[in-house]
């Protein structure tokens, strides 16, 4: 999966945020809708799409979808 595809799938985890607002360099924690529940949805999506198990620490290390994508790629 390429970065753009990942960003689209990442953006789909937000119910009330327009997906076009989320880019590879968006600081997702700054989004009003960001919560631990969205974080869990992202972890589940990554497990399903990439077969990679993210930990809470991985989520804390990433500030943007691109940083998270790079963490996932390093675990593949």
List PLM regions with ranges.
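Phosphopantetheine-dependent thiolation modules in NRPS/PKS and related acyl-activating systems
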Residues: 1-34, 38-43, 48-76
């Amino acid at each position: 999966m390429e970065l753009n595809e990942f960003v689209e799938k990442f953006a789909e985890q937000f119910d009330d945020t327009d997906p076009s607002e989320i880019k590879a360099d968006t600081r997702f924690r700054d989004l009003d809708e960001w919560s631990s529940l969205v974080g869990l949805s992202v972890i589940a999506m990554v497990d399903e799409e990439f077969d990679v198990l993210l930990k809470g620490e991985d989520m804390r290390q990433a500030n943007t979808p691109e940083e998270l994508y790079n963490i996932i790629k390093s675990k593949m």
